[in-house]
């Protein structure tokens, strides 16, 4: 049977990046002890008050269709959170609730870009980005960011890539996979480019609450940017709610109207009991949230400490997020070959940097998703793998 060209645009290297993770999961299911550091799924449970809110909502009979745009109570809380964190004044009409930030990104791209449009994206990039932009026929124009520069975008390099076909920039800070955050001066320079060339800014801020060093800057808060910025966020990482699929877009009211139309034919709204749980998540600070954030910071510091003096390895200290990139080029192997060897011989699953783009070649990404002792053991095995390759084990 014949399939649409669309199926080819959403396949490719990004989809294949998860193969090593699925191999590791298969071995876990067979009873092997594998240390899984290959995916950004928090090892924490969702805080109990959030879970209870969903249960209470279900018991109250909230199992019917909900507002396609998202419950007003939830959208108001999201608007308040965004206003508090960014300084940008927004209201509930500038918020659309969707099934996670991944869905939010897909919806925004469908509403902003046409076939043949160009979007400038920092590379390395999250593995689904290319497929998401390709789905609408847009062309990704990568701006390489290198480990030697801390994986940070340089505004002058972005400027050199702008053409008459450029329609948008898409950036995330803290960055996935590197955890690098952009300073205010860089955001201001990028904002000037957006205004000068009439571009959209798609700002993925999923890791903004896991920023340990520096200041989080939301580009929508900068002068002239509110009407040309779509801000994406979710509860997945900050609240350990990856499986709940709660995300949103904050943007101009006109964009939100288009997103609502797309949500109508794509989702028909998020489940009300999940939205009620999300309301509880955003109602008041939960002590579990700061505890999780502090745990990620300690884990980051632990990995840097454990690998800092390991021959053949150079861990790169992230500003935030839940990953650490490690330069393994001195071992002589490609990142994919190193990751395969690490899984096959040492029982540790990580992602190869090549999965995120050529600028991350020679690096591996490991998730801060295990407790201190398993993470320390994973670092020991990573160091041993490198030492074997250098003939020092």
Curated annotation (Swiss-Prot):
Induction: Induced by L-arginine in the absence of ArgR, via the AruR/AruS two-component regulatory system.
Gene Ontology MF, one: transaminase activity
Keywords carried by this UniProt record: Aminotransferase, Arginine metabolism, Pyridoxal phosphate, Pyruvate, Transferase
GO BP terms in the entry: arginine catabolic process; arginine catabolic process to succinate; biosynthetic process
EC number: 2.6.1.84
Disulfide bonds: none
InterPro entries assigned to the protein according to its UniProt record, in alphabetical order: Aminotransferase_I/II_large, AspAT/PAT-like, NHTrfase_class1_PyrdxlP-BS, PyrdxlP-dep_Trfase, PyrdxlP-dep_Trfase_major, PyrdxlP-dep_Trfase_small
Pathway: Amino-acid degradation; L-arginine degradation
Catalytic activity: L-arginine + pyruvate = 5-guanidino-2-oxopentanoate + L-alanine
pH dependence statement: Optimum pH is 9.0.
Cofactor field: pyridoxal 5'-phosphate
Matching Pfam families: Aminotran_1_2 (PF00155)
PTM-bearing positions, type N6-(pyridoxal phosphate)lysine: 237
CDD domains in the record: AAT_like
Annotated function: Catalyzes the conversion of L-arginine into 2-ketoarginine via transamination. L-arginine is the best substrate, but it can also use L-lysine, L-methionine, L-leucine, ornithine and L-glutamine, which indicates that it may have a broader physiological function in amino acid catabolism.
Name of the protein in its database record: Arginine--pyruvate transaminase AruH
